[in-house]
Amino acid sequence: LETLIRGLFGDETLATERPLVCLTFDDGCNFDFRTLVFPGFGEQTGFLQIMEQFVEKHGKSAQPGIHATSFVIADPRARELIDRKALFAKGHMSDDWWCEAEDHPLMTIANHSWDHNHPDLEEGGPYTRGGFEVVKTHEHCHQQVVAAAEFIKNKTGRYPDLFAYPFGESSAYIREEYFPRQQT
């Protein structure tokens, strides 16, 4: 993904003789990085292991540049709640793998917001819950983007350059005002 973005902005030449694909994973589930047992389905091979198996079987030249970006939710409380409500409370939304993933040549950790502005979070503080189109003030954007990025940097040692909107949603404010003002 980072290579494609650098190419689109003219910072890098892209090899375009073949179609390009970007692998991204949202929310930061442990399945992005490791193989786990999932209730009712047994052992589920992690995405990283699938990529490693591909490289081992076909060689790096079969898919040069194979790489994935895991967009993670920063807030431990939000991850615990999502894990409890959606993943059988098995602890599958931890951050104990982020640093190792960031150091791995096949994966990068990026920003998917502080808490996803997830509707299941009972306490929204001063902000409306339910989606990302309601993130409409500088303060709310800053909390969702910068606070998350700083937390991720503290875990991985690298400030995440990329942000993926939760639910694929965004307000006009975050798209047209907040992010453009953050560019240097």
Where in the sequence are the language-model features?
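Alpha-helical scaffold elements lining the catalytic groove of polysaccharide deacetylases
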Residues: 36, 93, 99-104, 114-156
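Charged, glycine/proline-rich intrinsically disordered loops and linkers
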Residues: 37-44, 127-132, 175-184
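Active-site environment of divalent metal-dependent phosphoester hydrolases
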Residues: 31, 116-118, 167-172
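Sec-exported extracytoplasmic/periplasmic mature domains
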Residues: 30, 52, 56, 146, ...
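His/Asp/Glu-enriched short active-site or ligand-binding loop at hydrolase and phosphoryl-transfer sites
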Residues: 1, 159-160, 169-184
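A short acidic (Asp/Glu
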Residues: 34, 80-83, 121-122, 172-178
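Active-site beta->alpha N-cap acidic-glycine motif
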Residues: 1-106, 159, 165
